[in-house]
Curated annotation (Swiss-Prot):
GO terms for molecular function: calmodulin binding. It comes from Mus musculus. This is Phosphorylase b kinase regulatory subunit alpha, skeletal muscle isoform. Both isoforms are expressed in muscle. The keyword Cell membrane applies. A lipid is attached at residue 1238 (S-farnesyl cysteine). Its main location: membrane. Gene3D superfamilies: 1.50.10.10. The lineage of its organism: Eukaryota, Metazoa, Chordata, Craniata, Vertebrata. Belongs to the phosphorylase b kinase regulatory chain family.
């Protein structure tokens, strides 16, 4: 008989340990593990982690088998794992209705339960009696389902189960925007049942999605139908949000030890090695103690100060748990595993020794890992005074099976029984390894032969869409519809993937659908409902963004391939040449670089071997040879009106396979194109219809008169509040380019001269006749507007003999017409009438919220300014925006547009939003108009009109300059660049010498430019280089510096007006006021501002801002680094409606925070910040008067009472705001200051 090897003996020892601590508790029927002896429920997360030691031991036996007996042990252990995983599957599959509902609702009431009955797999508590929504638990199950399947275990047994797992993928793919209760089941750390976005859930979901992608759940015995499909864009959404959260864990937890499972084993979800190390160091620095790590700061679980009879904490109670949080040895097991996977032998040795010291020896010397160590109740005060000095006692479960399992797994790996690749067969541990450079393949296609000829004349040789056959080209929305059939199962009542827009990663692959290759055009070209794709410059910008995104986020095998079609809308207005922006982009791509990406242009057929190609096996024919299974026909036949056209498919011919699929997609394409005479709109009647009609082209006086004729009472109740002034100007009536001879016809308001019949009523037929005769697009829009408001959208004008035409249809036709000539003011105007909404609006809103940015729409104060703090359904979101816009459809449309741009920048340049936690879109729009008025030296009316007439690309560019803080200027010309009707307004970056880029390079000189642009603001570096903090060459005492710009002093409106007598000496006037207005509107504060506010609150009873108090008790609930605290402070500051005044209050608070570093216990009760600002204002006025300034120069802002010059003063220097604010703060709190500090007075 062969003797047992040493390794075999050691493995037998681990087998005894596993049986005595884990497997002895496994239910023989369900395979589930109870939480402990006294807690018989089975938690999903704990079960998965607890079985890992069994799985690892089985792999070790399989690898190190000395005898057949060892192989039998390996099989037994592996089947114990399979039994548990299938037990959890049975628990969840019983709740299949919840999975179906949650895909659409993301509601906590529709979530899978977090724990089940160990004996029956049934639920144990009600939907609303536990924090069930824990996406990390479902994700960790799916992650190890993938890893175990890849290691050779057979867990999934039927296609029904495959479909269920596919729907679990849809369940977790929205983790990046779903607030849940997290790994500790508490949600917000106040333990009041408030869900929040958790980095641990997002990271684990990202790992599970990546692990399952293209995995065959039947293993080597599977086929195409058992493969799981994951959309790469959803994975990257999770990655973006995860990177934006880390090293924070959530809005209420600035750090959490559970993040170890995200940055290291098992998820390995973070690709940035620096961020991985930063997160680990945060955990070690802030959470590690002598017995393990705290879960998070101020965690009250099982501490002596926790009241076990009360489920929730009081917010101020959290301070009691500081420094006495329980320490969990569990997290040291993660550090051991992390050291093994990263090859850090010293780390492994250090934490193994530390863990051995806290293990408890059980019966027969069995090492047991306790759940946690707590401070003894009689030594709490001692621990408060000297943290980490008191000896703690073990509490909770013994052993803690989750920790016990990871301890055993770490020991097996540390002793060489398992290699990292065996426990991680999907190679997730290489996530931080640098990826090879990405070359984006771009295939340029011409829509027609004519466009191909035009491109050839420019030296660009392309194919037409017809010439790439047999490769099929389809728009992105078709791919969304195709994926909506993925996971369908009528027997389980699973509908498949919810319809969502397709991202650029999804459209940059080729797809094999029944042996036919399909390629899909980018989503941004396929904008059906909104007008962004009408702007060729915007198309170029979105293409540049997508290319850059692909280079940084592409992780799949093969190179990304973008199919870029050139359509007739990308031609110039004469249709004989290509738009200059499009042509320039094509030339750059041909040169090999565009948008920071390496580009390879070529034919689609040349890219077949190098592209990433996905086989959509779920599109393969069913058992009877049909294109789809019966499930899909039932779900989508009615929606697509497909009839029986696909029932006669004959599967014997591969050629006919491709043709049949093509016919199906063509049919689908036809049904997804909106009918040209059925543009989306909403019927309005009565007063609502009238209110909708009060818009930019309406004369208010004539509307009042017309309202009397319509017998509408209290008409002023329905007139919208204007954005910038009491009465919004009407847009200029600009004639159609087809009739230049009419260009001198004066602009008229149609409603002023409404034709009347003999009885005095409005003669609508005459109005229709006017509509037919006029060639002015503006007049056509005005007339249709009046018909829309007075007769309704479905009124038949009988304009055409055959069938007539409704108002809605005519507006849609006009929309197309103005779109062709790029009249952006009218495009937005008609888009507002027709209630056209941006398709990705709700996704844009959700993206912003997922980055922990709250949104407000409308202008302050509340309740006019509406706050969006959680994702909303599309209809609810558009309704809220309409309400905040107070009936102004143009503002409503612009708000949606700005929201989309903000989301674009958030995804690509999140650094623009540093230290901003609330994006106030109403104020941003107002500031954009103000900047136009200031830069162009024009009136409010002209600025408003100019803003509405900006092209989408120019609007996005202006927004970027405002967000980035770059120097920029604006030029206006009567010679337009892209339209015969819209005035051109271009935004240029300012160079070091103060000229615009175009002037500096001499590319173009606009003879008709109105005025030289001026700087947006002076850079801090420029200011610091000058004496006293003021720009060199500026006389501080000169009227041009001390007084407001003459135009501001003389103007009674919201914006400065043109002043001809201004000189170049005045060019810097208003710079600091503009900067404060911008920073205040954007909620921009200095780095570390909120942490400093937290410190000052500890030394006073609170800060008062215009009557709203930020109490010191806030610090008892929240820690300095919490996003929740920053949002709370920001919400108090946002009570101030004037942005520049708000920013001055921020500067005053900054001065106060300097007092926090002084060794003083208290600096008073509640500090009124606005009083400090007003004291500083008085000091400033006194000093300026002694220097000879008169009352005209020292004009005050009527809203705040602050001198305009103080707003326009630089922060530093003798006359800087910080000087006066420091003196004012010292005056206000001098009785609490040391005597030496009062000397500054």
């Amino acid at each position: 008989m062969r003797s047992r090897s040493n390794s075999g003996v050691r493995l037998d020892g681990y087998a005894r340990l596993v049986h005595q601590t884990i497997l002895c508790h496994q239910n023989p029927v369900t395979g589930l593990l109870p939480a402990s002896y006294d807690q018989k429920d089975a938690w999903v997360r704990d079960n998965v982690y607890s079985i890992l030691a069994v799985w690892g031991l089985g792999l070790a036996y399989r690898k190190n088998a000395d005898r057949d007996e060892d192989k039998a042990k390996a099989y037994e252990l592996e089947q114990s794992v399979v039994k548990l995983m299938r037990g959890l599957l049975h628990c969840m599959i019983r709740q299949v209705d919840k999975v179906e509902s949650f895909k659409y609702s993301q509601s906590t009431k529709d979530s899978l339960h977090a724990k089940y009955n160990t004996k029956t797999c049934a639920t144990v508590v009600g939907d609303d009696q536990w924090g069930h929504l824990q996406l990390d638990a479902t994700s960790v199950y799916l992650l190890f389902l993938a890893q175990m399947t890849a290691s050779g275990l057979h867990i999934i047994h039927s296609l029904d189960e495959v479909n269920f797992i596919q729907n679990l993928v849809f369940y977790i793919e929205a983790a990046y925007k779903t607030a849940d209760f997290g790994i500790w089941e508490r949600g917000d750390k106040t333990n009041q049942g408030i869900s929040e976005l958790n980095a641990s859930s997002v990271g684990m979901a990202k790992a599970a999605l990546e692990a399952l992608d293209e995995l065959d759940l039947f293993g080597v015995k599977g086929g195409p139908q058992s493969v799981i499909h994951v959309l790469a864009d959803e994975v990257q959404h999770c990655q973006s949000i995860l990177n934006s959260l880390l090293p924070r864990a959530s809005t209420s937890k600035e750090v959490d030890a559970s993040l170890l499972s995200v940055v290291s084993f098992p998820a390995f979800a973070v690709e940035d090695s620096h961020l991985v190390e930063l997160t680990k160091q945060e955990i070690i620095t802030k959470l590690q103690g002598r017995y393990g790590c705290c879960r998070f700061l101020r965690d009250g679980y099982k501490t002596p100060k926790e009241d076990p009879n009360r489920l929730y904490y009081e917010p101020a109670e959290l301070k009691l748990f500081e420094n006495i949080e329980c320490e969990w040895p569990l997290f040291w097991t993660y550090f051991i595993l992390d050291g093994i996977f990263s090859g850090n032998v010293e780390q492994v040795q250090e934490y193994r020794e530390a863990l051995d010291a806290v293990l408890i020896k059980g019966k027969n010397g069995v090492p047991l890992l306790p759940e946690l160590y707590s401070v003894p109740p009689d030594r709490v005060d001692e621990e408060y005074q000297n943290p980490h000095t008191v000896d703690r006692v073990p509490m909770g479960k013994l052993p803690h099976m989750w920790g016990q399992s990871l301890y055993i797994l770490g020991s097996l790996m540390a002793e060489g029984f398992l290699a990292p690749g065996e426990i991680d067969p999907l190679n997730r541990r290489f996530s931080t390894v640098p990826k090879p450079d990405v070359v984006v393949q771009v295939s340029i296609l011409a829509e027609t032969e004519e466009i191909k000829a035009i491109l050839k004349d420019k030296g660009i040789d392309v194919e037409t869409i017809a010439e790439v056959y047999p490769i099929r080209v389809q728009p992105a929305r078709i791919l969304s519809h195709i994926y909506s059939s993925l996971g369908c199962n009528s027997r389980m009542k699973l509908s498949g993937r919810p319809y969502r827009l397709m991202g650029v990663l999804g459209t940059s692959k080729l797809y094999d659908i029944r042996k036919t290759i399909f390629t899909f055009t980018p989503q941004f070209i396929d904008q059906q409902q909104f007008y962004l794709a009408l702007d060729n410059q915007m198309i170029v910008e979105m293409l540049r963004t997508d290319l850059s995104y692909l280079c940084s986020r592409w992780r799949m095998t093969g190179q990304p391939t973008i199919t870029f079609p050139i359509s007739h809308t990308m031609l110039d207005e004469d249709g004989t040449s290509l738009n200059s922006s499009i042509l320039a982009a094509l030339r750059k791509m041909q040169d090999g670089y565009f948008g920071g990406a390496r580009i390879q242009t070529g034919k689609l057929s040349e890219f077949l071997t190098t592209s990433c190609c996905t086989h959509l096996s779920f599109m393969d024919p069913g058992p009877e040879g049909k294109l789809y299974s019966e499930d899909y026909d039932e779900d989508y036949e009615d929606d697509l009106d497909s009839g029986n056209w696909m029932d006669s498919y004959d599967s014997t011919s591969n050629a006919r396979c491709g043709d049949e699929v093509a016919r199906y997609l063509d049919r689908l394409l036809a049904h997804t194109v909106p009918h040209p005479k059925l543009a989306p709109t909403s019927r309005k009647g009565g007063l609502d219809r009238f209110r909708a009609a009060v818009q930019t082209t309406c004369d208010l006086m004539s509307l009042v008169a017309k309202a009397k004729e319509l017998h509408i009472q209290n008409v002023h109740m329905y007139l919208p509040t204007k954005l910038f002034q009491p009465s919004r100007p009407s847009l200029n009536l600009l004639d159609s380019p087809e009739s230049p001879q009419d260009s001198q016809v004066p602009s008229v308001h149609v409603e002023v001269h409404l034709p009347r019949d003999q009885s005095g009523e409005v003669d609508f037929q005459s109005l229709v006749s006017q509509l037919k005769e006029t060639s002015s697009l503006q007049e056509q829009a005005d007339i249709l507007y009046m018909l829309y408001s007075m007769k309704g959208p479905d009124w038949n004008t009988e304009l055409y003999e055959e069938g007539g035409a409704t108002v809605r249809e005519l507006l849609s036709e006009l929309y197309v017409k103005v779109g062709e000539i790029r009249h952006w003011g009218l495009i937005r105007y008609i888009s507002g009438i027709l209630r056209k909404k941006v398709e990705a609006l709700d996704e844009a809103c959700t993206d912003l919220l997922s980055y922990q940015k709250h949104l407000t729409v409308g202008l302050p104060p509340e309740p006019r300014e509406k706050t969006i703090s959680a994702p909303l359904p599309y209809e609810a979101l558009t309704k809220l925006i309409d309400e905040a816009s107070e009936g102004d459809m143009s503002i409503s449309t612009l708000t949606q547009e700005i929201m989309v741009y903000l989301a674009m920048y958030m995804r690509t340049q999140p650094g623009l939003f540093a230290e901003m936690f609330r994006l106030r879109i109403g104020l941003i729009i107002q500031v954009m108009a103000t900047e136009l008025a200031h830069s162009l030296r024009c009136s409010a009316e002209e600025a408003t009109e100019g803003l509405m007439n900006l092209s989408p690309s120019a609007m996005k560019n202006l927004l970027h300059h405002i967000l980035s803080g770059k120097e920029f200027g604006v030029e206006r010309s009567v010679r337009p660049t892209d339209s015969n009707v819209s005035p051109a307004i271009s935004i240029h970056e300012i160079g070091a010498v103060g000229a615009t880029k175009t002037e500096r390079t001499g590319i173009m000189q606009l003879k008709s430019e109105i005025k030289q642009v001026e700087f947006r603001r002076l850079s801090v570096s420029m200011e610091s280089q000058t004496s006293g903090g003021h720009p060199s060459g500026v006389d501080l005492m000169s009227p041009s510096f001390l007084s407001p710009a003459a135009c501001i002093a003389a103007s009674s409106g919201s914006f400065p007006t043109v002043c001809d007598h201004q000189t170049s000496k005045d060019s810097r006037q208003g710079q600091w006021q503009r900067r404060r207005r911008l920073d205040g509107a954007l909620n921009r504060v200095p780095i570390g501002f909120y942490q400093k506010v937290w410190k000052i609150l500890q030394k006073c009873h609170g800060l008062s801002v215009e009557g709203f108090v930020l109490p010191s008790s806030t610090t008892r609930e929240m820690t300095p680094g919490e996003i929740k605290f920053s949002v709370h402070v920001e919400s108090v500051l946002n009570r101030v409606p004037q942005p520049e005044y708000r920013q001055l209050l921020v500067e005053a608070i900054l001065v106060l925070t300097m007092l926090a570093d002084i060794e003083i216990h208290s600096i008073g009760s509640i500090i009124a910040v606005e009083k400090i600002v007003h004291i500083a204002n008085d000091l400033f006025l006194q000093e300026q008067k002694t220097l000879g300034a008169d009352d005209t120069m020292l004009a005050k802002d009527p809203a705040s009472g602050i001198c305009t010059l103080l707003y326009d003063s630089a922060p530093s220097g003798r006359f800087g705001t910080m000087t006066y604010l420091s003196k004012a703060a010292a005056t206000y709190v001098q009785e609490f200051l040391p005597h030496s500090l009062c000397a500054m007075q």
